[in-house]
């Protein structure tokens, strides 16, 4: 049992391998997430390898703890060779340690990504030699069908127990080396039961697949529907993205995306967020295209297309999927070594030996009831068929496969679940029993093995979907709904929703040139007047596994002029209902629901404004009290938004300098399949000390927060402009062409702001995680150590599961920006005096001016007090004033910079004029010389 002193150790001590949890020693870290770390461990006596998932309880809110306990309860009841088993669960005062099966080949996403390097790994060398991957394609079809059979076996088992996984994706499909390779290895792997590491489908010579991560799984009978938004966006079913009621068929969509990625090497739909993802799915209209380089059979393509249907009614049913020809038939193209040499009697099929009261798998599929043809049974038969076994009493924890009692015992260690005490969460002190949010299935109440309901008919499903198109849900149920987006149980943050909602609305209505084009008045409900919440770096955001590369900047022109992917034709507001439910949960009020048009566009568009909370009128839009024409108001709005976007881009570029020092490259994933052991991994941050990482993280974080603040102000102004435009308050004397130009101009900036906002939000979360981890590694007496934190912090947003971020006193974005502007101005002044690199001087002066304007920028116009750091703006202004020596304030500094910029531009103009005169004189001289050499025509004397 882990004591309190073990739980309070830092992550650095965890990596040392000196800790122990129960009967297991903790080794090196093999995985990491926002709330948990995964370590390689060994049993103290048997030396069998395990995976230890250590979850820090302080980082979890109530809902996340319920998800964790739900995962534990589900894993306690599941025993299947193709589902990752839970060996033990040990809870201390600050951590929950899940002892799970160790899958040393990593997950399927890494397997697909490194498919060209599989020949270099000992565990996959033979497979890559027999079934190589084609260039510009995915895995070999034999490997695809092998994994499909094993995944189908796991899903069929879950289906028999009325479970829906809800997060099937390559990252949750873990791989073990093949059984022959494991038998040759000296390092054993702990097995949950005597046959948990023996596959029951597929080929014995290929890696073994196991389904993992049941944090989003729940009991869902075949007649029930769920409405929780959870899972991973790239693999979410469209009905989940639309926030509609869904059933277990959502897992079949995810299976289709996994099959497509295995076949092509990439997901079928790629997007930055779930709104764009749903837009692409709807635009495809169920037309799934495969690259020409992909060489798979038409049967496999047809199966993938039948799974990737937008409508659950049209999607392949579970019964048809389990009995599909691709799943049950012989795998084509096998090498001679992988073809079974003999066929066993159907009565000896071990898959009919389930020892639980739940519906057996043998009664659910014709391929398991003895009606298989010899060709179908050739490959679908389990590798266990060569090991006949007798029935054995299973444990109460779940179903067990029977095995011959006199079979030799394997050398690997056995799970604690094999003992008579069963699996429970061991606590250091006596506490009340925990309550899992997922109701446990009463297996004893199941009468007979044929209890499983047949699949609902097409007519019944259509009738049910119509009845539930607008189901009555109480306010309490809405408030309790999850809004989770990645595998780390991420809650959608309020400002994140607002920014994307407004950008989608503008993109969808870009052609709205005049308010008169709108048909009918806009029905508005009451919404709270106020500013959005703070957008800080302490926000839980989806962690991206991809490299966050940024393009170098050679100029200080408006970077939002780049090409944007805003398509008015295909733009749609996919999560309108999700926005309403999230607003009720996160904001405290509800935005108006959407009214579906008679044609029923899917998804419906947002209404004109109330989706985005009304901000107070910003300073940039206030005039002198006189009536201003619509053209002037639109122009001022566009100019103000562009200025804020440009200032935020300057601050973002400064933050990127810090970020690239912290994250020079994306996390390398070459080690697991590159032939290296986890113990051989080196720390990629050895080039920076812990103090340097803390300093860089703090500076990058406050700069990212400042950039987010400017971007949020730009969206506030765009929101106010759009609300007036939608109500028809402006544009009375504006031509249609001019109005369209202004709308397109502002829409382009808004789309750029949305893209940059999401990017900065993601990077700020990465920096925040690095900062908190680095602070834990500091000495205990260091001022920045968590035990010595003061009150200066960036407060986390309401409802965020993350802790506060503590900053060193005196760190502020304004001070950093002022120092940077001063440094750039001095360097530019030296070049100006020497008349060197005047173009660089201009860029430096422009950047310095915009940074100073960002320093002067305040949040008074937006009405958002929470957008300020807890240290206060006044203290930061005083710090800037102290740096300048009290001689000039920030306004005077900006004025001086503008004067210097004007002087530089004047010099550049003079140099350009002098160069043009020199070129003109040179061209005239060349023309005269060439004229002397040109033959002249002889005058004609014919007339004389």
Swiss-Prot record:
Amino acid composition bias (Low complexity), ranges on this chain: 356-367, 563-572
Domain Protein kinase: 24-327
Alphabetical list of InterPro entries matching this protein: Atg1-like, ATG1-like_MIT2, Atg1-like_tMIT, Kinase-like_dom_sf, Prot_kinase_dom, Protein_kinase_ATP_BS, Ser/Thr_kinase_AS
E.C. designation(s): 2.7.11.1
Compositionally biased tracts (Basic and acidic residues): 865-881
Gene3D superfamilies linked to this entry: Transferase(Phosphotransferase) domain 1 (1.10.510.10)
Keyword Cytoplasm assigned: yes
UniProt cross-references to Pfam families, sorted A to Z: ATG1-like_MIT1, ATG1-like_MIT2, Pkinase
UniProt-annotated stretches for the region Disordered: 344-423, 443-475, 512-572, 777-801, 860-895, 925-944
Keywords assigned: ATP-binding, Autophagy, Cytoplasm, Kinase, Membrane, Nucleotide-binding, Protein transport, Serine/threonine-protein kinase, Transferase, Transport
Reactions catalysed according to its record: L-seryl-[protein] + ATP = O-phospho-L-seryl-[protein] + ADP + H(+); L-threonyl-[protein] + ATP = O-phospho-L-threonyl-[protein] + ADP + H(+)
Superkingdom, natural source: Eukaryota
GO biological process: autophagosome assembly; autophagy of mitochondrion; piecemeal microautophagy of the nucleus; protein transport; regulation of autophagy; response to starvation; reticulophagy
Chain span(s) of sequence motif LIR: 428-431
Residues that hold ATP according to the record: 30-38, 53
GO molecular function terms attached to this record: ATP binding; protein serine kinase activity; protein serine/threonine kinase activity
Main location: cytoplasm
Bilayer topology term: Peripheral membrane protein
Coiled coil: none
Family: Belongs to the protein kinase superfamily. Ser/Thr protein kinase family. APG1/unc-51/ULK1 subfamily.
Domain-level remarks: The LIR motif is required for the interaction with ATG8 and for the association of ATG1 with autophagosomes. The C-terminal region of ATG1 responsible for ATG13-binding comprises six alpha-helices which fold into two antiparallel three-helix bundles resembling each other.
Function: Serine/threonine protein kinase involved in the cytoplasm to vacuole transport (Cvt) and found to be essential in autophagy, where it is required for the formation of autophagosomes. Involved in the clearance of protein aggregates which cannot be efficiently cleared by the proteasome. Required for selective autophagic degradation of the nucleus (nucleophagy) as well as for mitophagy which contributes to regulate mitochondrial quantity and quality by eliminating the mitochondria to a basal level to fulfill cellular energy requirements and preventing excess ROS production.
Protein's recorded name: Serine/threonine-protein kinase ATG1
Native source species: Gibberella zeae (strain ATCC MYA-4620 / CBS 123657 / FGSC 9075 / NRRL 31084 / PH-1)
């Amino acid at each position: 049992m882990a004591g309190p002193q073990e739980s309070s150790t830092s992550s650095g001590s965890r990596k040392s391998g000196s800790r122990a949890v129960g009967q297991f020693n903790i080794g090196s870290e093999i995985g990491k997430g926002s709330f948990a770390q995964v370590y390689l461990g060994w049993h103290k006596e048997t030396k069998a390898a395990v995976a230890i998932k250590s979850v820090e309880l302080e980082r979890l809110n109530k809902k996340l703890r319920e998800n964790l306990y739900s995962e534990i309860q589900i894993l306690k009841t599941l025993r299947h060779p193709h589902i990752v088993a839970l060996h033990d669960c040990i809870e201390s005062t600050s951590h929950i340690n899940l002892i799970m099966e160790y899958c040393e080949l990593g997950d399927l996403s890494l397997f697909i990504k490194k498919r060209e390097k599989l020949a270099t790994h000992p565990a996959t060398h033979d497979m890559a030699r027999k079934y190589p991957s084609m260039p510009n394609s995915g895995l070999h079809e034999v490997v695809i069908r092998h994994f499909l059979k094993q995944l189908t076996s796991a899903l069929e088992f879950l289906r028999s127990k009325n479970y829906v996984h809800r997060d099937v994706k390559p990252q949750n499909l873990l791989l073990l080396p093949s059984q022959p390779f494991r038998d040759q290895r000296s390092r054993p792997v702990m097995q949950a039961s005597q046959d948990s590491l023996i596959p029951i489908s597929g080929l014995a010579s290929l890696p073994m697949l196991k389904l993992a991560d049941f944090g989003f799984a729940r009991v869902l009978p075949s007649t029930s529907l769920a409405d929780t938004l959870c899972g991973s966006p790239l693999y979410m079913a469209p009905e989940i993205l639309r926030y509609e009621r869904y059933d277990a068929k959502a897992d079949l969509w995810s299976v289709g995306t996994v099959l497509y990625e295995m076949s092509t090497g990439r997901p079928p739909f790629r997007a930055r967020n779930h709104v764009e993802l749903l837009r692409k799915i709807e635009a495809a209209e169920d037309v799934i295209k495969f690259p020409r380089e992909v060489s798979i059979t038409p049967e496999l393509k047809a199966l993938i297309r039948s799974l990737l249907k937008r409508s659950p009614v049209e999607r392949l049913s579970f019964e048809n999927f389990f009995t599909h020809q691709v799943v049950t038939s012989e795998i084509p193209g096998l090498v001679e070594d992988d073809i079974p040499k003999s066929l066993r009697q159907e009565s000896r099929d071990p898959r009919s030996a389930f020892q639980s009261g739940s519906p057996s798998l043998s009664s659910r599929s014709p391929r398991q009831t003895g009606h298989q043809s010899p060709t179908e049974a050739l490959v679908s038969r389990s590798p266990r068929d060569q090991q006949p076994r007798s029935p054995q009493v299973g444990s109460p924890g779940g179903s067990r496969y029977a095995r011959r009692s006199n079979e030799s015992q394997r050398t690997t260690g056995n799970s604690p679940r094999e003992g008579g005490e069963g699996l429970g969460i061991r606590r250091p002190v006596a506490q009340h029993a925990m309550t899992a949010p997922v109701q446990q299935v009463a297996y004893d109440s199941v009468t007979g093995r044929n209890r499983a309901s047949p699949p609902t008919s097409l007519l019944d499903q259509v009738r049910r979907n119509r009845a539930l198109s607008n189901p009555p849900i109480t306010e309490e149920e809405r408030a309790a709904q999850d809004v989770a987006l990645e595998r780390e149980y991420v809650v959608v943050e309020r400002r994140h929703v607002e920014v994307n909602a407004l950008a989608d609305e503008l993109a969808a209505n870009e052609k709205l040139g005049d308010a008169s084009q709108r048909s009918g008045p806009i029905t508005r409900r009451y919404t709270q007047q106020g500013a959005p919440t703070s957008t800080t770096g302490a926000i839980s955001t989806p962690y991206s596994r991809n490299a966050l590369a940024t393009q170098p900047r050679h100029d200080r022109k408006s970077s939002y002029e780049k090409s944007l992917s805003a398509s008015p034709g295909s733009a749609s507001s996919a999560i309108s209902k999700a926005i309403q439910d999230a607003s009720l949960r996160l904001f405290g009020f509800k935005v108006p629901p959407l009214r579906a048009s008679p044609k029923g566009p899917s998804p419906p568009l947002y209404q004109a404004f109330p989706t985005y909370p009304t901000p107070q009128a910003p300073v940039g839009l206030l005039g002198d009290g006189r009536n201003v024409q619509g053209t002037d108001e639109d122009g001022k709005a566009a100019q103000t938004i562009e200025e804020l976007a440009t200032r935020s881009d300057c601050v973002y570029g400064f933050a990127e300098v810090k970020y690239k020092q912290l994250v020079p490259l994306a996390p390398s994933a070459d080690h697991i399949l590159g032939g290296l052991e986890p113990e051989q991994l080196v720390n990629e941050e050895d080039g920076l000390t812990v103090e340097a990482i803390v300093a860089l993280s703090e500076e990058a974080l406050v700069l990212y927060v400042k950039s987010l603040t400017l971007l949020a102000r730009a969206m506030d102004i765009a929101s106010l402009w759009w609300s007036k435009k939608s109500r028809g308050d402006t544009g009375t004397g504006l031509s249609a062409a001019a109005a369209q130009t202004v709308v397109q101009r502002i829409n382009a900036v808004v789309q750029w702001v949305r893209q940059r906002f999401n990017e900065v939000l993601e990077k700020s979360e990465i920096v925040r995680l690095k900062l908190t981890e680095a602070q834990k590694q500091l000495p205990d007496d260091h001022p920045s150590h968590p035990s010595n934190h003061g009150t200066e912090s960036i407060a986390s947003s309401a409802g965020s599961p993350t802790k506060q971020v503590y900053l060193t006193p005196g760190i502020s974005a304004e001070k950093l920006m002022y120092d940077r502007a001063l440094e750039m101005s001095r360097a530019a002044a030296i070049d100006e005096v020497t008349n060197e690199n005047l173009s660089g001087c201009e860029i430096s002066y422009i950047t310095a001016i915009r940074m100073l304007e960002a320093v002067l920028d305040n949040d008074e116009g937006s009405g958002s007090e929470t957008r300020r750091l807890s240290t206060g703006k006044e203290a930061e202004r005083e710090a800037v004033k102290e740096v300048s020596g009290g001689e000039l304030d920030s306004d005077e500094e900006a004025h001086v910079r503008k004067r210097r910029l004007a002087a530089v531009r004047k010099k550049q103009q003079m140099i350009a004029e002098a160069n043009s005169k020199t070129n003109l004189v040179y061209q005239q001289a060349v023309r005269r010389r060439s004229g002397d050499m040109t033959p002249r025509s002889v005058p004609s004397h014919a007339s004389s």
